[in-house]
Amino acid sequence: MSQIRAIVGTQWGDEGKGKIVDFLAKEADVVVRAQGGSNAGHTVEAFGKIFKLHLIPSGILYKDKINIIGNGVVIDPESLIEEIESLQKEGISTENLRISDRAHLVMPYHKILDEEQEKQRGEESLGTTKRGIGPAYTDKTERTNLRVCDMLDEDEFVHKLRIVYERKNRILTEVYHKTPMKFGELLEQFMKYGEILRPYITDTIKLLNDAIKEGKKILLEGAQATMLDLDYGTYPYVTSSHPTVGGFCIGAGIAPKHIQEVIGVVKSYTTRVGKGPFPTELLDRVGDSIRERGKEYGTTTGRPRRCGWLDLVVVRYAVLINGIDKIALTKLDTLSNLPKVKVCVGYRHAGKILDLFPASLKVAMECEPIYEEFDGWSEEEIKKAKEYDQLPKNAKKYIEFIEKETGAKVFLIGTGASREDIIIKEN
C-alpha cells in the first residue's frame, strides 16, 4: 500500500517546511509540489551549502527521488530554468524532475500587471511578491491562460496567445502607460523555454497515480501556509492558491482518500510578510531580536518578516482545517536565551474569548492576545541536545503545552539550521 504524507504550513508561511520536507524525503520515493509559484521560497541547508528553492521540490537534493511540479503550480519558465541551472552548477542533478503538462504559465505581462496593480492600490496594497502569481491565477480562472503543454506546440501557442495578446497590450498601454509587448518576441521566448524544459514535461497525474498503485512513498510539499489560503486565510492578505491539504489534492491530481498522514509545520514563534492582521506581533526589542536570531528575511523578496509570539489560536485553526495528525516544530533554538517566552492561547474581543481565528479582518485587527508565560532556556542546552530527553526542562514544558493545546503530537523538533539539527520525539 502506498504511503502519502502531506506537509502543510500552519501559520503565514516561512515555518521551515523546506527543511522538514528535506528530512522526510529520505524515506520517500516521490516529492510533489502542488500549488503556488515562484512567490514561495524554501531554504534548505545541505552539503555545507544553502539552497534556496522557489519552484522545485526540496527532494531534488536527493539523487534517487522523483520530484514533481504539479498541475496546480503556476510556472514562470524563466525562473524555473534559472533554478535548474543554479542547482546543476552546484552539482545537483535535475534529471529526476518532472513538470506537469497541465500546469499554467506565468507570462511576462502577468509580472508587469502584478507590480502596477500593487502601485495602484496605494495604501491598500496587499504586499505581493510582484512575481505575477495573482494575475496568472486570475487568467487561469477566466480560462484565458496558457499552459505548459502549449509551449510544446507552436501552432497551439500562437492560437492561444493571439486571443489574449491585444487585450493585454491595451491594458498595459492605456491603463498603465507601459511599453506594448511584441508578439514575435513573446513567441520566440516561450518556444525556447519549451525546448529547454521539454525533457522534464510529462503527464504527472498518470505518473503520480501509477506510483500510488505501485505502493510508492509520496510526500506532498506545501508552499505558503494555511493563513495565506484564499478561502481560509486573512483575506484579502492571502495568496491566490490553496496551501491547505484540499488544495494539494487538486494541485497534484490525487484523490483525498490516498492521504494517510498530515504533518503540520509550526514555527516556535510566528512571522508574516506584508500586510494583514497579526495579533501576537512584537514591535519591540524582543521582536527585533527574534528577527535577527532567526534570520527572518524573505527567501524570495529579502523583506524583513514581522515577528511575534507563537499563536496557538492560529495553529489550532490550521489543525482543524487540515486534519493535522502530527506537528513538526521548527526553530526552537531561535527562542533561546530569552528570560520569558509567551504563547497566545486565545483572543479577547468585545468582552468575548475567541479560541479560533475570526473571519472578519476588522475583528482580527482588534483582537487582544491572551498569553501563557514560560521560563526560557539557554542556547547551549538546546545545541547539546540530540534526543528529546536531553532538551532543557523548560523547552519540554513549552513543547508539551503546544501538544495539549492543539491536540496534535509533536514528533520532530528543529534545533538549528542544518538538516542534521532535528530531534525525533517518540510518542
Swiss-Prot record:
Alphabetical list of CDD domains matching this protein: AdSS
Pathway: Purine metabolism; AMP biosynthesis via de novo pathway; AMP from IMP: step 1/2
Subcellular location: Cytoplasm
GO BP annotations, alphabetical order: 'de novo' AMP biosynthetic process; IMP metabolic process
Binding site for IMP: 14-17, 39-42, 129, 143, 224, 239, 303
EC number(s) stated in the UniProt entry for this protein: 6.3.4.4
A GO CC term assigned to this protein in UniProt: cytoplasm
Active site: 14 (proton acceptor), 42 (proton donor)
List of residues binding Mg(2+): 14, 41
Residues binding GTP, per UniProt: 13-19, 41-43, 305, 331-333, 414-416
Positions of region (Disordered): 117-137
GO molecular function annotations of the record: adenylosuccinate synthase activity; GTP binding; magnesium ion binding
Binding site for substrate: 299-305
Catalytic activity: IMP + L-aspartate + GTP = N(6)-(1,2-dicarboxyethyl)-AMP + GDP + phosphate + 2 H(+)
Cofactor: binding comment: Binds 1 Mg(2+) ion per subunit.
Keywords on record: Cytoplasm, GTP-binding, Ligase, Magnesium, Metal-binding, Nucleotide-binding, Purine biosynthesis
Assembly with partners or alone: Homodimer.
Family according to the record: Belongs to the adenylosuccinate synthetase family.
Function comment: Plays an important role in the de novo pathway of purine nucleotide biosynthesis. Catalyzes the first committed step in the biosynthesis of AMP from IMP.
Name by which UniProt lists this protein: Adenylosuccinate synthetase
Organism: Caldicellulosiruptor saccharolyticus (strain ATCC 43494 / DSM 8903 / Tp8T 6331)
